[in-house]
Amino acid sequence: MADDKPKEGVKTENNDHINLKVAGQDGSVVQFKIKRHTPLNKLMKAYCERQGLSMRQIRFRFDGQPINETDTPAQLEMEDEDTIDVFQQQTGGSF
């Protein structure tokens, strides 16, 4: 019997889409399906609209590194089911 599912950990280069999770600080997780060569600003804007947030209020990070709007999943070497973390923008402070 042939197994049609790709093996765990094996990259399928012919698959143009990738499933990404966006995890908020409140524990919420939103899933997106995006093309590997599509700039991540499309995902960022969709997340903000869905959550009722402004792009100015939050920051997106992958593996601890800030994500630029022009970055693509392919450039960041993202794999299927990877998670992007969302953080509230810190403003001000007090002494």
UniProtKB/Swiss-Prot annotation:
InterPro entries: Rad60/SUMO-like_dom (IPR022617), Ubiquitin-like_dom (IPR000626), Ubiquitin-like_domsf (IPR029071)
Entry superkingdom: Eukaryota
Prodomain positions: 94-95
Cross-link (Glycyl lysine isopeptide (Lys-Gly) (interchain with G-Cter in SUMO)), chain numbering: K11
GO cellular component, one term: nucleus
Key word Ubl conjugation present: yes
Assigned keywords, A-Z: Isopeptide bond, Nucleus, Ubl conjugation, Ubl conjugation pathway
Subunit structure: Interacts with sae2 and ube2i. Covalently attached to a number of proteins, including top2.
Disulfide bond annotation, renumbered to this chain: none
Residues covered by the Ubiquitin-like domain: 16-95
Family according to the record: Belongs to the ubiquitin family. SUMO subfamily.
Cellular localization per UniProt: Nucleus
UniProt function note: Ubiquitin-like protein that can be covalently attached to proteins as a monomer or as a lysine-linked polymer. Covalent attachment via an isopeptide bond to its substrates requires prior activation by the E1 complex sae1-sae2 and linkage to the E2 enzyme ube2i, and can be promoted by an E3 ligase such as pias1-4. This post-translational modification on lysine residues of proteins plays a crucial role in a number of cellular processes such as nuclear transport, DNA replication and repair, mitosis and signal transduction.
Statement: the UniProt record of this protein carries the keyword DNA repair: no
Covalent cross-link site, Glycyl lysine isopeptide (Gly-Lys) (interchain with K-? in acceptor proteins): G93
CDD domains registered for this protein in UniProt: Ubl_SUMO2_3_4
SMART domains according to UniProt: UBQ
Record's comment on post-translational modification: Polymeric chains can be formed through Lys-11 cross-linking.
Name the UniProt record assigns to this protein: Small ubiquitin-related modifier 2
Chief place where the protein resides: nucleus
